[in-house]
């Protein structure tokens, strides 16, 4: 028996911000590969410890992977002419959100400090009887950031937490299963891979396995449309034929 101390984060932005501060990274120049590796390591640790993995963490992992893929795409070359076009950094949207999150994290911390300072001077009980004496400021920087997003966005969809059960399936087992299938078939749709999945948790584990194999350059995953099916193929097969 041994105890593992695992830091708990309020949300994906809290985890990302922690990794950026830990590695002393400039927000304007984030090495996505480094952050993605450490982010996926945390997700895998949660899964191995049989803990709940909120779907928002998985969505952020997919976002980081998409950014990495875009950054790895070769730049187009035009013969006979040079086109000076301002390239859009795939990290731009993420950086903007992280900067906003940082602002509200600082504001939240400032509020907490103000509450601490105020408690040193105002010790008398309030005269108004209907005020509950147990009222406290139970908020976090992640809560404030989420509230801000709700104000500026019409998207009020709630993301449910999905429990991943270690006893039934693991990332490692799904990786092996996918690699075996890719030996038999040249390409495979993600919908085919999860066809026999019995629970949402198993689908999430399968998706993490795909992300991990893409990160390790073992497979190529292509998605033509948003929320569309994902085409999976062994790394090198399609590339060699195209070249």
Swiss-Prot record:
PANTHER family in the cross-refs: SEGREGATION AND CONDENSATION PROTEIN A (PTHR33969:SF2)
Protein name: Segregation and condensation protein A
Location within or outside the cell: Cytoplasm
Keywords of this entry: Cell cycle, Cell division, Chromosome partition, Cytoplasm
InterPro entries: ScpA, ScpA-like_C
Physiological role: Participates in chromosomal partition during cell division. May act via the formation of a condensin-like complex containing Smc and ScpB that pull DNA away from mid-cell into both cell halves.
Signal peptide segment: none
GO cellular component annotations of the record: cytoplasm
Gene it is expressed from: scpA
């Amino acid at each position: 028996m041994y105890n593992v101390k695992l830091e708990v984060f309020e949300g994906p932005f809290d985890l990302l911000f922690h990794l950026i501060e830990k590695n002393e990274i400039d927000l304007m120049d984030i090495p996505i590969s480094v952050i993605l590796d450490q982010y996926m390591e945390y997700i895998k640790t949660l899964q191995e410890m049989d803990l709940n993995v909120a779907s928002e963490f998985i969505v952020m992992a997919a976002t980081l992977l998409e950014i990495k893929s875009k950054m790895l795409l070769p730049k187009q070359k035009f013969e006979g002419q040079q086109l000076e076009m301002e390239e859009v950094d795939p990290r731009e949207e993420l950086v903007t959100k992280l900067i906003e999150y940082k602002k509200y994290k600082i504001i939240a911390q400032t509020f907490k400090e103000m509450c601490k300072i105020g408690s040193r001077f105002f010790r008398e009980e309030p005269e108004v009887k209907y005020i509950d004496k147990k009222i406290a400021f139970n908020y976090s920087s992640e809560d404030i950031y989420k509230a801000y997003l709700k104000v500026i966005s019409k998207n009020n969809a709630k993301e449910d937490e999905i429990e991943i059960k270690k006893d039934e399936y693991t990332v490692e087992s799904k990786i092996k299963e996918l690699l075996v299938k890719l030996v038999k078939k040249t390409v495979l749709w993600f919908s085919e891979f999860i066809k026999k999945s019995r629970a949402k948790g198993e689908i999430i584990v399968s998706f993490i396995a795909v992300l991990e194999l893409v990160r390790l350059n073992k497979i190529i995953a292509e998605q033509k449309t948003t929320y569309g099916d994902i085409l999976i193929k062994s790394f090198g097969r399609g590339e060699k034929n195209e070249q």
